[in-house]
Amino acid sequence: VSGNSREIIRASSLWLSGTPMINPMAKNRFFFEIGSSSSLLTNNRYKYPNVDIGIKVTKNLSILNKVFGFKADNEYPQIIGAGLQYYFGSRDSLDWSATVQRINLKGLKYFSLSSLSIDLRKWYYLKSYKFRLGIGSNYFKERTHTNTDVLPLLMKGQTNYLGFDFSLPLRTFNLGLEN
C-alpha cells in the first residue's frame, strides 16, 4: 500500500474534522462559515472547500451541519455530517467549547471515508481578536470500493491533534484562520 495513499486518507480525515468557530458569547443564532483547506503531500497540493452551518439552540449548545458537494477532477464528492458544540465555563464567559461530530465523505470512485471527531478548545480574547486553542482526536474509517493495489480494502486510524483558530471582525463578517 502506498504511503502517499495513507497520507491522503489521513489528511482528508483531518480536513473533515474541522470545527466551526462559533463564538459562545455572540448573540447570533445562525452561523455560516465558508473557507478552504490545503495540504501539501509529497509535492502535490490538495485544496478542499469548507462549509459549516451552525444553529445555536441554547446559550451553551449549537448544532453543527456540513452538507455540500464539489467537483474534483472528474469526481463529485459529497460531504454529509452533523455534530454538537457545547460551551461551558463561568456564567459570564463560557470560554470553553467541546465538539463532537461525525462527517462522511462519499461520491468518490475508489473510496469513502467516515470521520468521528472529539475536540476541546479554550477561547481567548485580545482586543477585537479571538483565538481558540485546544486538543482533539479524530477517528476515521476508509472503505475501498474497487480492488486496487494503492488503497487497502479497509483502513482505520486515529489522529490526535493540537488546534489553533484565530479571527478578527471585519464589518459584519469575521475573517479567520484555522488549523
Question: How should each PLM-predicted stretch be described?
Answer:
Residues R29-F31, K59-N65, R91-W96, S128-F131, ...:
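Repeated loop/turn-to-beta-strand initiation elements of outer-membrane beta-barrel proteins
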Residues V1-R91:
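Transmembrane beta-barrel domains of Gram-negative outer membranes and organellar outer membranes
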Residues S36, P49, N65, Q78, ...:
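Polar/charged side chains located within well-ordered beta-strands of beta-rich proteins
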Residues I55-K59, Y86-F88, K122-Y124, F166-L170, ...:
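Residue-level signature of outer-membrane beta-barrel architecture
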Residues F32-S38, N65-G69, A82, A98-R102, ...:
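Transmembrane beta-barrel strands of outer-membrane/channel proteins
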Residues S37-L41, F68-N74, Y87, R91, ...:
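Sequence/structural signature of outer-membrane beta-barrel proteins
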Residues V1-N23, L41-N43, L108-G176:
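Outer-membrane beta-barrel transmembrane domain signature
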Residues V57-T58, G81, D92-S97, S112-S114, ...:
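A general secondary-structure boundary signal
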